Each structure stands twice: as C-alpha cells, then as structure tokens.
C-alpha cells in the first residue's frame, strides 16, 4: 500500500472521528426544541415602493446603515443610490465596466463599492468636496471575478472572488492585507459577523467557511449542501448563519454546535436560491429564488410563512434594513421593490 493511500485512509478516519464527535454533541434537534413554540403564522408583506430607473438586470443591492438609502448595481452599467422613502435617485454613477456582480454601502455612508467580471473592487466617494461622485480607489489583485464585497469601515473592505479566495484590503494603500485561502471552488458570497471580527463565505465547493478577519485563518468548515452555495447571511446574534444553494435548499448552521441545524426546503421548490437575509429578530429567513419569488421561512420551525411575489424575473438580491422595518428585493426585471 502506497504512502498516499495510507494518508487517504488516515484522513478518512479523522473525518469519521469528527463526524462521530459532532453526532455525540447533537443531543437534540432544533425541531424538537422549538416544538412547543407557536408558529409565526402567515406573513403578508405588501410592495410599498417600486424603484424604477435601471435599464437592465439588477444584480446586487445593499442597504445603508441609515435604513433609508440603498445602492443597487445593474447590467446597464450604472450604480444607483436610492432614497427608499421618496424613490428618488440620490446618485447615478456610471461604471467603467458594466459587468458588475456586487455592490456595498460603507457603514459611514461615505463610500460605496462595486465589482464583477473586471476582477476589480472599485470604491466610490459619495462625499467629495465638489459634490460629484468619483472613483477613489480601484483594488486590483484578484485573478477571478469579484462576487461579493463588504466594508468593515471606511478604510477596510473584504472581498470574495471566483479565484477561490477572499481578501481583506487596506483601501488607503490599495493593497491586500490578508488573503483567505481554503475553498476549492469559486467563492460566491460573504457575510460579516455583527462584531466584524469574523466573516463567513459560501462557495461552489458546496461548503461554507468561517474566517477570522485579523488572523486570516479558517476557523470552521461547514458541509451539507449538494451544490454551489450562492448566498450566505449571519444570524443577527452572530452565533449562526444561513446559506442558499443551487440544490434548492437553504440551511442554518450553528458556530457553537459546529453543524447544520435546519434545512429549509419544499417539494414544490426545485430551483436555486440567489440570496438570503434574516429579519432583525432572526425569526424569519427571507430567500430569493430563480422562479421569480422570494420565500419567507420561519427560521425556527422551517415552515414557509409567506411569499413575496411581484417580480417578473429572477430575484437576484435582497436585503433587510438595519432597523428591521423593510425588505428590498432586486430582480432581473430591472426593478427594486421595497416591502413591509
């Protein structure tokens, strides 16, 4: 028996040991524990606003921390900052590359970022002295498309890429300060923990990984999905996260239990998930699907509690405001809708 086979065998044994240890910890299921909790009942949300202005598919959106302004990115080559109260466009930013896949609003409200098939994360300053919006930095370093980006603060941003890595950037210097390697497929999405010390990433290797922002190391790896993970979102308390995948399921993983707690699926749902987001309390999980709908799940009981139907094409992105008062969905039909 060759050395390689021996190592393979050892690796399998270790994997089995880990699986057994996890099983030993799992003394009850989430379903059993939440059995005596009342269901949330039917959740009915109405479209309060429709944001019209993009001329092509919308690929990404992100709320500002004020829960009023949001940024959206479209195949029409524009980044639009919207006032969701009035539906006015605050800024319309022409992009150098129209192949944009992600956008992000800085917590301060001073900057937005975007990127896509140009492999570059472009940072735009919204608060210049002249009043015009301009590129303040172009972060080049990834060797694959930019799939997701999120600001830690005005000078730090985390990106995920089709080159299988994530990166932490110093915006001032334009340099990658940390590279997060470990995925074996395109990284599709990332989500920062509430304290911004950790983040999770979901990738086309069907795994999710938990990373330490400062140390640059992978803390935990979560498996269970049977296809690409397209979307990922932290639970509001930072102890768990949800994923959405092409296998037509969303799943809830717990950091402390080190395993999957719940699967959100239905026999009628056979299409992939593009985006996931929790309500402010974490009781509801909202997920956007390829079949033009957005399903609202009871996160504790895994029952479907409602549907947001109104788009005429794939729901590509969604987000819940920081104050928990509204949901925005963006679609390939070129419209954004605000619901509550």
Swiss-Prot record:
Ranges occupied by WD repeats: 46-94, 95-140, 141-181, 182-223, 224-267, 268-309, 310-340
Q: What is the effect of changing residue 337 to Q?
A: In MRD42; uncertain significance; no effect on protein abundance; no effect on complex formation with gamma subunit; no effect on trimer formation with alpha and gamma subunits; no effect on receptor-driven G protein activation
**Gene Ontology terms, cellular component aspect?**
cytoplasm; cytosol; extracellular exosome; extracellular vesicle; heterotrimeric G-protein complex; lysosomal membrane; membrane; photoreceptor disc membrane
Q: What is this protein called?
A: Guanine nucleotide-binding protein G(I)/G(S)/G(T) subunit beta-1
Instruction: Recount the PTM note.
Output: Phosphorylation at His-266 by NDKB contributes to G protein activation by increasing the high energetic phosphate transfer onto GDP.
Q: In the record, what terms sit under GO molecular function? A: GTPase activity; GTPase binding; protein-containing complex binding; signaling receptor complex adaptor activity
One matching Pfam family? WD40_Gbeta
What the protein does comes down to: Guanine nucleotide-binding proteins (G proteins) are involved as a modulator or transducer in various transmembrane signaling systems. The beta and gamma chains are required for the GTPase activity, for replacement of GDP by GTP, and for G protein-effector interaction.
Question: Whose protein is this, by species?
Answer: Homo sapiens
* Cystine bridges: none
């Amino acid at each position: 028996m060759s050395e390689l086979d021996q190592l393979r065998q050892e690796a399998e044994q270790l994997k089995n040991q880990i699986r057994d240890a996890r099983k030993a910890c799992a003394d009850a299921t989430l379903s059993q524990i939440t059995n005596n909790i009342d269901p949330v009942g039917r959740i009915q949300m109405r479209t309060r606003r429709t944001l019209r202005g993009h001329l092509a598919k919308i690929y990404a959106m992100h709320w500002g921390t004020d829960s009023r302004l949001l940024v959206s990115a479209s195949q029409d080559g524009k980044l639009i900052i919207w006032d969701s109260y009035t539906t006015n466009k605050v800024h319309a930013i022409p992009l150098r590359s129209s192949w944009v896949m992600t956008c992000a609003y800085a917590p301060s409200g001073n900057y937005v970022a975007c990127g896509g098939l140009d492999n570059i994360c472009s940072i735009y300053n919204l608060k210049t002295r002249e009043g015009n919006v301009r590129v303040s930095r172009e972060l080049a370093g990834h060797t694959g498309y930019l799939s997701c980006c999120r600001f830690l603060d005005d000078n730090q941003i985390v990106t995920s890429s089709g080159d299988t890595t994530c990166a932490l950037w110093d915006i001032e210097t334009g340099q990658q300060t940390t590279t997060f390697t470990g995925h074996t497929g395109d990284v599709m999405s990332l989500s920062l923990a509430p304290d911004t010390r950790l983040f999770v990433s979901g990738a086309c290797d069907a795994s999710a990984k938990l990373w330490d922002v400062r140390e640059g190391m992978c803390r935990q790896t979560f498996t269970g999905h049977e296809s690409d993970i397209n979307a990922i979102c932290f639970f509001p308390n930072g102890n768990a996260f949800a994923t959405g995948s092409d296998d037509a399921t969303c799943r809830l993983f717990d950091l402390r239990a080190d395993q999957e707690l719940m699967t959100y699926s239905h026999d009628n749902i056979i299409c992939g998930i593009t985006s996931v987001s929790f309500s402010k309390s974490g009781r509801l999980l909202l997920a956007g699907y390829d079949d033009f709908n957005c399903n609202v799940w009871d996160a504790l009981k895994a029952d479907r509690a409602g549907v947001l139907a109104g788009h005429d094409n794939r729901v590509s992105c969604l987000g819940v405001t920081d104050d928990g008062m509204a949901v925005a969905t963006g679609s390939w039909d070129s419209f954004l809708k605000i619901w509550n």
